[in-house]
Amino acid sequence: MESECLTPEWASQPCLMGIDEAGRGPVLGPMVYGCMYCPISYQSSLASLHFADSKTLKEEKREELYESLKLDKSLGWAVDVIDPRELSAKMLAKNKTNLNEISHNSAMGLIKRVLDMGVLLTEAYLDTVGDPDKYRIKLSERFPSIKFVVSKKADSLFPIVSGASIVAKVTRDRALKEWLVEETGEDINRNFGSGYPGDPETKAWLVQHKHSVFGFPSLVRFSWGTCTTHLKGEVEVAWEADENEESGNGSSSKRQAKLSSFGFKTCEKRSEEIESSGKGRCKFLQARKIQQLTQF
C-alpha cells in the first residue's frame, strides 16, 4: 500500500475521507483502491479544484489533477494496489473470497491506515459495492466513530470521492505502463487495450499470449470467466486430487472446486494409465502430487 508518508499538521482536526476504486472489471492488471482525505473545514474548497469522476476525464487531465492534489498541503491520499495474482488466488481458493469482500477489505484497510497515522476521521464517503445499506452497516460496525455515506455514483456526487477516483485511476494506469512482466521467456507486448473483456484489443492480446499448458502471463486474472472460455480445448491435465475425490476418498462434504471448472481441461485417462503416485517415485514428487504424463 502506498500513501503520503507524513502525518499532516491538520490531522487532529475533524476530517472527511472519500474512497473509490479503479480496475474492478478488467481481466488483467491490478485493482486499485484509492482514498483522499482533508479537514472538514477545507470541504468547501474542494469544488474549486475541479475534481470529477475519473472515467469522464481524459488521461492528460487526470494526470494534471493528480499532480496538483499531491502538492496541496490540505489534502492527504493513499492507495491499495491489489495484484492480479492475489485476486485470482483469493477467488479460486478452497475458502473463496469474492470480489465484493476483497473490495470491502481494501476500503477498510485504507481507513485503518489513515486512522493509524493519527488522522481524526469523522466522515467517510464511498461508492457502493453491493447493497449500499448493508455496506454502510458493515463499515459502521468496524469503525463506529465515523459517519459513513455509501452511495451509487458517489464519484460523481461528492468531490472528495472524485479526488479518490482520480488517485486510484492514475495509480492503476501508471502501474500497467510500468508493469514488470515476469514471463521473460515469452515475447509479450503491451498492446492490451483497456483490459476489459469486451475490448477487441484485449481479446486479441489474450489470444496472442495464451499458452496451451500454463494459460496466461501473471498480468491476467485467471479467476475471470473470460479466461475459462479462452482455455477450453487446451492441453488436458490429470489432477490426482480430482481423481481421489471421484473415487469417494474426499472427506469433506464441501469440496474444493476442480481446476477443470476454471478452464483447465481434465484428462480422461484413468490413474492406472499414468505413472503411479506411490511406490518408486521420489518423496518430493509424491508430496506435491506431481505425476508424469506420457503424452499430451
UniProtKB/Swiss-Prot annotation:
Please write the reaction equations for the catalytic activity of this protein.
Endonucleolytic cleavage to 5'-phosphomonoester
Q: Which enzyme class, named as a word?
A: hydrolase
- Per the UniProt entry, the Enzyme Commission number(s) are 3.1.26.4
Which Gene Ontology terms describe the biological processes this protein takes part in? RNA metabolic process
Q: Which cofactor does it need?
A: Mn(2+); Mg(2+)
Domain (RNase H type-2): residue spans on this chain: 14-236
Question: Which is one GO molecular function term here?
Answer: metal ion binding
- Free-text remark on how the cofactor is bound: Manganese or magnesium. Binds 1 divalent metal ion per monomer in the absence of substrate. May bind a second metal ion after substrate binding.
Task: Name the source's superkingdom.
Answer: Eukaryota
| PROSITE patterns listed in its UniProt record | RNASE_H_2
Keywords on record:
Endonuclease, Hydrolase, Metal-binding, Nuclease
Recorded hits in Pfam families, A to Z, give:
RNase_HII
The residues the record assigns to binding a divalent metal cation are D20, E21, D127
Would I find Transferase among this entry's keywords?
no
Task: State the InterPro entries in the record.
Answer: RNase_H2_suA (IPR004649), RNase_HII/HIII (IPR001352), RNase_HII/HIII_dom (IPR024567), RNase_HII_hlx-loop-hlx_cap_dom (IPR023160), RNaseH-like_sf (IPR012337), RNaseH_sf (IPR036397)
Database matches in NCBIfam families? ribonuclease HII
In the record, the note on similarity to other proteins reads:
Belongs to the RNase HII family. Eukaryotic subfamily.
PANTHER family linked: RIBONUCLEASE H2 SUBUNIT A
Q: What does this protein do?
A: Catalytic subunit of RNase HII, an endonuclease that specifically degrades the RNA of RNA:DNA hybrids. Participates in DNA replication, possibly by mediating the removal of lagging-strand Okazaki fragment RNA primers during DNA replication. Mediates the excision of single ribonucleotides from DNA:RNA duplexes.
Which protein is depicted?
A: Ribonuclease H2 subunit A
Organism of derivation: Arabidopsis thaliana
Q: What taxonomic classification does the UniProt entry list for its organism?
A: Eukaryota, Viridiplantae, Streptophyta, Embryophyta, Tracheophyta
